[in-house]
Amino acid sequence: MRVQDVYNVIYTHTEGEPLCIIYSGVPYPAGSTILEKRAFLEENYDWLRKALMREPRGHADMFGVFLTPPSSRDYDAGLIYIDGKEYSHMCGHGTIAVAMAMVANGLVARDPSGLTRIRFETTAGLVVAEVAHEDDRVLWTRFENVPAYVAAQDIAFELPGYGPLKADLVWGGNYFGIIDLRGTSLRIAPENGSELSRMGLIAREEIRKKVTVQHPTEAHINNLNFVTFWHEPTIEGCLYKNVHVFSAGQLDRSPGGTGTSAMMAYFEARGVIGLNQPITSEGLLGSGTFEGCLIGETTLGTVRAVRPTVKGTAGMLGTASWTINREDPVDAGFLVL
């Protein structure tokens, strides 16, 4: 065995959804934009993504982020989100977690007011987080996400075993195909995870056949990666319960941050909620919740959009210094799906 590389990471979870924060060891090109940094990672460090997200260090539902230096004084840090298969434009549960981890671990200076503001550069755009802290405790994160909008409504498709359904295509930092399950027998619960994953991948392929995906102002954003199933909540006070299926069939354990943003845009477009109306979202596990609110409207090019905020909390799980032997194909990472 020959140790070739050592990388330091922080592990967190946000209402059960994991995050591996990779904060050292990558020599990003000086002055590069966040898109240039992602291209640099894809070309030179994709092996690191695979090694940390996949087995034996990770698992099929692992999620992570490269915490990068800012590209300009307009930002405090950059975020490039990853999983075992690919890259994501944004992640809300991850933003909640990485912001809290930065404050808790001294990676950003604490504001004496007890509310520290962090400006993140993502490949979806600017995301501004506020982290509340008191003494040595970090309490919660609220972030204003990129603007959200509904791109298409009532996309008809067939879901095997559950009949004809309709989906809305919504942008909330990632593109989501949002599907109402209330008229079906499929329930959102951990014990139904395999079926939810399987149906989510089928639904995504069906929706992809019906729509062309293109962000109004960001030419590089043109893919549907997430499917969201939702139905009535099981926690009192929540507007809905949902699960987000993405990548190779991963299930988001949390209520979802970009997902909550997309869901608020979805419900606002259908007249269920209004601007400045707080909502609470419930995730797969039926335990944790996020708080959301649409604080205004804006435009993306000529398209009307809304401004979502999401609030949640994350827990610190631990740290690790990983040694990686790239000559060992098992050590380099593998997936069992």
Swiss-Prot record:
The keyword Isomerase applies. It holds the Pfam family Pro_racemase. Substrate binds at G92, H93, D252, G257, T258. InterPro entries: Pro_racemase_fam (IPR008794). Keywords: Isomerase. It comes from the Bacteria. One of its GO terms (molecular function) is 4-hydroxyproline epimerase activity. The active site is at C91. Its EC number is 5.1.1.8. It is an enzyme of class 5 (isomerase). Gene3D superfamilies: Diaminopimelate Epimerase, Chain A, domain 1 (3.10.310.10). SUPFAM superfamilies: Diaminopimelate epimerase-like. It catalyses: trans-4-hydroxy-L-proline = cis-4-hydroxy-D-proline. Belongs to the proline racemase family. Catalyzes the epimerization of trans-4-hydroxy-L-proline (t4LHyp) to cis-4-hydroxy-D-proline (c4DHyp). Is likely involved in a degradation pathway that converts t4LHyp to alpha-ketoglutarate. Displays no proline racemase activity. This is 4-hydroxyproline 2-epimerase. The lineage of its organism: Bacteria, Pseudomonadati, Pseudomonadota, Alphaproteobacteria, Rhodobacterales.
